[in-house]
Amino acid sequence: MARHLITSAIPYINGIKHLGNLVGSQLPADLYARYLRGRDNEVMFICATDEHGTPAELAAAKAGKPIAVYCAEMHEVQAEIARNFGLSFDHFGRSSSERNHVLTQHFAGKLDENGYIAEVEERQVYSIDDGRFLPDRYIEGTCPNCGYDKARGDQCENCTKQLDPTDLIEPRSAISGSTNLEVRATKHLYLRQRSLKDRIAAWIDSKTDWPILTTSIARKWLNDGDGLQDRGITRDLDWGIPVKKGDKPWPGMEGKVFYVWFDAPIEYIAATAEGADKRGEPDSAWRRWWRLDEGAEDVTYTQFMGKDNVPFHTLSFPATIIGSGEPWKLVDYIKSFNYLTYDGGQFSTSQGRGVFMDQALSILPADYWRWWLLSHAPESGDSEFTWDNFQQSVNKDLADVLGNFVSRITKFCRSKFGETIPQGGSYGPEEEALIQALTTRIRAYEGFMDHVEVRKSAAELRAIWVLGNEYLQSAAPWSTFKTDPDKAAMQVRLGLNLIRLYAVLSAPFIPFAADAMLAAMQTENRDWPDDVRAALEALPAGHAFTVPEVLFAKISDESRDEWQDRFKGIRG
């Protein structure tokens, strides 16, 4: 049994996430985790809420709540929405946990011990009207690289360029909007990434199987311009992980906290520990996933994220791991995604533009969204969500192909043989050809899933569904029944077994529909079809079943138009 560690980029706590966030990290990570579990691998699937930094402080202030209260409430909101979308995390943690405090302070202490921390006096933006230093994300302005007028002081979300606040044109306070700013001296800790550049570059060069999107971004930040720069890892904030050197005070750093992008990736490790704590397991239970000297040498670690997160996961977090000098597990494969756009523009949490996860679930079940998002995942380039395309894909793929097959075969069997799988007949050339075609397609599906090629996997799965419809149309058991009831019984028996097969193969994409199909077939048999012929005999003659409710209702033109109108503006 292979062991797979999977992490999804952890979402900011500042509100409910939109569909672009979902398809860029959590959803494809869940797809992969479900697939690997279905193939009998040992999987640890981790995510969390990212609760520190400017977004949390600003959102709590806007909500009029203490930040700790706000974060606790929003964690539960995000966790519930994740459950409703079928995201099968083994643990959904919190970056504000005690585990993350201890681990973050531990890593900082080790980095300092190994000479990779520098204390730097820098000049930072201070808002006179707000009476405080403004961390990067508290400052907005125009990006000097692309001209986007809502760029933040750490990164432009439009062109993804990493920025310093002083780079912005016409900067203003994100708290008050004041332009009454000045630059003052303050002291901070810097991670000496430049000293680790050669080791990081060699590590990236060794990853010859990574997606081009991932490696191109990593190499850009590693080599372009002045190359990899040292990065500040502390901030003048009240909320966050206090700066300590392991478990000891850090002189001169009193009142400061670690930068959110230093502690957030460490939460992957901390969340694994949180999960073990919750289950009452010893430390060895989580360390076997993360420590090469304690059992993690046989773990394959895959990360999922949007392309804007790639620099932090290919440079800064590996610098932390490598610089610690300890045998922590480095990522083996980073699956990164481009952007999902919305009706000609960008999805945006900060701007409230697009369809958000709670809104999506209020109008349609999760599987509708899961299927469209994964089958249109922005892998090789940006993808665009339009209501027309959403309607067409759902109606054609889910209703006309899969749903239609399940409905036709179960209803026909009930009408001619009752609600038990009929006996009689034996396979002929048509069935043998179907088994061969299914075997070829399923092996291709496995290959695409093994390599985390999401869109190709979806296309192959749909082709597998189509084979069932084509067989049913060609075999026409409703006609065969008139002259050869035994042969019709065999055709129906094969068709009903196909439903179980489809449920198993489809579960990573549409888990709720898969559960419904298995429930209708009155089986808990989720065995993977390594042998397709055997899989099509899993449910024997005499096995009872029920005709399920409609798996997928079609989206009407009226509903499409209503939703398009409802979500054309910004979220209030």
Swiss-Prot record:
Signal peptide span: none
Locations listed in the record: Cytoplasm
Alphabetic keyword roster: Aminoacyl-tRNA synthetase, ATP-binding, Cytoplasm, Ligase, Metal-binding, Nucleotide-binding, Protein biosynthesis, Zinc
GO biological process: methionyl-tRNA aminoacylation
Enzyme type, top EC level: ligase
EC number: 6.1.1.10
Cofactor: record remark: Binds 1 zinc ion per subunit.
One Pfam match: Anticodon_3
Chain location of the short sequence motif 'HIGH' region per the record: 11-21
Any Gene Ontology CC annotation: cytosol
Cofactor annotation: Zn(2+)
Motif 'KMSKS' region positions after renumbering to this chain: 346-350
GO molecular function: ATP binding; metal ion binding; methionine-tRNA ligase activity
Catalytic activity from the UniProt record: tRNA(Met) + L-methionine + ATP = L-methionyl-tRNA(Met) + AMP + diphosphate
Residues at which Zn(2+) binds: C143, C146, C156, C159
Residue numbers binding ATP: T349
Main location: cytoplasm
Record-linked InterPro entries: Anticodon_Met (IPR041872), Met-tRNA_ligase_1 (IPR023458), Met-tRNA_synth (IPR014758), Methionyl/Leucyl_tRNA_Synth (IPR015413), MetRS_core (IPR033911), MetRS_Zn (IPR029038), Rossmann-like_a/b/a_fold (IPR014729), tRNAsynth_Ia_anticodon-bd (IPR009080)
Subunit structure as annotated in this protein's UniProt entry: Monomer.
Similarity field: Belongs to the class-I aminoacyl-tRNA synthetase family. MetG type 1 subfamily.
Function (record text): Is required not only for elongation of protein synthesis but also for the initiation of all mRNA translation through initiator tRNA(fMet) aminoacylation.
Protein name: Methionine--tRNA ligase
